[in-house]
Design a protein with these regions (language model features):
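RNA pseudouridine synthases
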Residues: 1-182
Length: 182
């Protein structure tokens, strides 16, 4: 969503949007390997109003992931606090002593003995939250280059499928969707 460090990571969605829409302002981020819906502001007012909705946890976010192994339960709530793993940045890790609150609801969409498809609904927005939570459950996201297994997948199987926000001008609910390409 934003430029990374180094010339090879300079190409990103924000840079491309600024070519066509120079006033584009960042509202939130997605991990570099995550696909799907993002929202940008075209005015400072819109950017501030939308960013506040993210900060206040008023945005409903829904992701789809393919994870390793067969998930046997139908749904659940993951409540595992997260903290930066300073020795292995950008990795995050579960830490019950100093970690920040991180909550994720999940729902099984389908599964077989090799993999499962989950709907993930983060209630907080910590860095790598969904990736660490899936790994902590013993079902890392397929193709995850940091928390997953060595994989034959050409990409990380995590997709931001839906965002629901209140329009910054009129306050009406707005829903943005992008079906997962996997």
């Amino acid at each position: 969503s934003v430029p990374g460090k180094g010339i090879e990571l300079a190409d990103c969605l924000l840079s491309r949007l600024k070519i066509a829409f120079p006033n584009t302002l960042l509202v939130h981020r997605l991990d570099r390997d995550t696909s799907g819906v993002m929202i940008f502001g075209q005015t400072e007012y819109a950017q501030r109003a939308l960013s506040m909705q993210f900060e206040r946890r008023q945005v409903k976010k829904t992701y789809v992931a393919r994870v390793s192994g067969e998930v046997t339960q139908k749904s659940g709530l993951i409540d595992l606090p997260l903290v930066v793993d300073w020795e292995n940045r950008p990795r995050q890790m579960v830490c019950h002593e100093t970690g920040k609150l991180a909550l994720t609801e999940w729902y099984k969409l389908s599964s077989n003995q090799n993999e499962s498809r989950l709907r993930l609904v983060p209630k907080t927005g910590r860095s790598h939250q969904l990736r660490v939570h899936c790994m902590a459950l013993g079902h890392p996201i397929l193709g995850d280059p940091i928390y997953g297994e060595v994989s034959t997948h050409h990409r990380m199987m995590l997709h931001s499928e839906e965002l629901r926000v209140k329009h910054p001008e009129n306050g009406f609910g707005s829903r943005f969707r992008s079906k997962a390409p996997f």
